[in-house]
Amino acid sequence: DLGATNARLAIVNDFKDLIYKSSYKISNFKTLEDLINHYLNEFNASRENLSGILGVAAPIIGNEINFVNIDFSFSVKEIEKSFFPGGLRLFNDVQLQGYALNSYPNDKLKSVGVSKGFPKGPKILIIPGTGLGLSILNNGKSLATEAGHLNIPNTSDEIQNLLENFKKENKRTATFEDLLSGKGISYIYGFLSQESNHNHSNEDILNNVRNDAFCDETKKILINIFAIFAKYTALITGSTGGVYLAGSLSESLLKDDDFSEFRNIFEESKKMNKYLSNIPVFLIKDNNLGFMGALEVYKNEII
């Protein structure tokens, strides 16, 4: 599971169990070859007849894979030749994590707002982090998207001022990923406080450890943008089976006291309120979705 910040690796044992689970900062490695070699050597893992499933924070286009938010790339053919004589399957990272929804336990899901049960239908998984990923799960198959690169609509005076400032500084229109992400937290706080060179961490801003009114306002704007993104993509994809939110940023941003606000913004629509009000929204607090998704692929498509 190769994100833009962290790389998580594991080996499947006896067709069902994950062993040798480990996590690394991907920036500590110059190449994917270095990373995989380091992992296999660390656990003295057998290299014989290995097959692989990789989820990558990049669009899957041809043989050359280029990550979007970091300077990292690799050749699919070279990686398969060097490490995986048994074959290599490649997925977008959030697409791979989307497969985990096929078997994720209902009792581990946290309902955002009043519970709507577990209706059938397409599902979407949204994971903000270094970037902003979204996958669609339909009839057991997970589909990758680049929905995070949609432009943010102007929905309020506050959002308008933020978007105008972004466009002035960057010479382009802001996308959802620009603001609903790690870099977006810092940018929004800097805009509100007029301190673009502040040294507050994203965690400090979201938890408001300094009792700072700009931190509260930053969080409010982020929840607004998050709920709007969830609403628009739910309408586009027809995800009547639910909207699933995951990743450390989702966990840090959405606390129990924020659920009703998120839900109200999500359902707000003069024409589609009834449709949206029947779509459940869940928060997943689990950093193993990539492994779980890979195991689903392994069990259902490879064995």
Report the location of each language-model feature:
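ATP-dependent carbohydrate kinase catalytic cores
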Residues: L88-F118, N208-D216, K220
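Generic detection of short hydrophobic beta-strand segments and adjacent strand-loop junctions
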Residues: S22-Y24, S111-V112, L150
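A glycine- and small-aliphatic-rich helix-loop capping segment at beta-alpha/alpha-beta transitions
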Residues: D14-D17, I70-S73, Y104-V112, N139-A144, ...
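Glycine-rich phosphate-binding loop of actin/hexokinase-like ATP-binding domains
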Residues: V114-T175, E261-E267, K271-L276
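Active-site nucleophile and cofactor-binding loops and adjacent substrate-binding regions
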Residues: N69-I70, R89-L96, K116, L125-P128, ...
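ATP-binding/phosphotransfer module of carbohydrate and carboxylate kinases, centering on a glycine-rich
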Residues: D1-N44, E48, I60, I136, ...
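Short coil/turn connectors at secondary-structure junctions
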Residues: P85-G86, P119-K123, S239-T240, N278-I279
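Short beta-strand-loop/turn "lid" adjacent to the catalytic site in phosphate-handling enzymes
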Residues: A45-L90, Y99-K108, L125, E251-K255
